[in-house]
A protein has these predicted regions:
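Pyridoxal 5′-phosphate
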Residues: 1-214
Length: 214
């Protein structure tokens, strides 16, 4: 957030509770006249809690602001519905739940937002090497320099695997392993699980709070 402030962007941070659950009332009250964009993590990389993207997307639509969802921890593990969540942008990395190589990722943009954005990185001018500036058409205007083709091919293979196995199957396996881990951790003294216990509202990321350690 600090880097955005350095560029003159006004940032409002909406709190979550100890388990990582978003305070919806605080979120609704956080909008200002100049609010343009809401950015939210779909699943916490600390406690595994999944935030209610559908509800947040509905509120953003009512307020008339763009909604960007960071799905780094959820893509490939739980289903994401671009339209149902009213997303303007979906950001994800390839090397986590999507099982792809490091250095890969994706940014899915709704047309209205893509048209409103200017390239933030330039170099090589992408597919239009004869130009002195980045192309103005999609997706080339956001693809500076040489693409990571080996990584993209590897990510494509991972996506094919996920499609073949099924996200629901992957989530069920992750759920079983995490549940077993949590059950055994619960037997230990002075150790608490951080995050919600409802498996409809979390992924397999599990963090621990050791009461004997400050």
């Amino acid at each position: 957030c600090q880097s955005l402030k350095d560029f003159g962007v006004e940032v409002t941070i909406v709190p979550c509770d100890r388990d990582g659950v978003l305070d919806i009332d605080a979120f609704k009250n956080s909008f200002k006249e100049n609010t343009k964009l809401v950015v939210m993590s779909h699943a916490s990389n600390v406690c595994g809690t999944v935030l209610d993207a559908e509800e947040v997307g509905k509120i953003c639509k009512e307020k008339g602001v763009f909604f960007a969802l960071d799905a780094a921890q959820s893509a490939g593990v739980i289903n994401i519905d671009f339209e149902k969540f009213n997303l303007s942008a979906l950001c994800l990395t390839g090397h986590k739940g999507l099982l792809g190589p490091q250095g890969t990722g994706a940014l899915l943009l709704r047309h209205e937002l893509a048209e409103a954005l200017d390239p933030v990185i330039s170099g090589g001018t992408g597919s239009a090497s004869h130009l002195l500036t980045m192309p103005e058409f999609m997706p080339d205007k956001f693809e500076a320099g040489t693409l990571n083709l080996p990584g993209i091919i590897g990510l494509n293979a991972s996506l094919e695997y996920i499609r073949r196995v099924g996200i629901d199957t992957i989530f069920e396996t992750e759920k079983q392993l995490a549940q077993l881990f949590i059950e055994e951790i619960d037997k230990l003294p002075n150790v608490k699980i951080i995050g919600v216990r409802d498996w409809n509202k979390r992924v397999g990321t599990v963090s621990l709070d050791f009461e004997s350690i400050d």
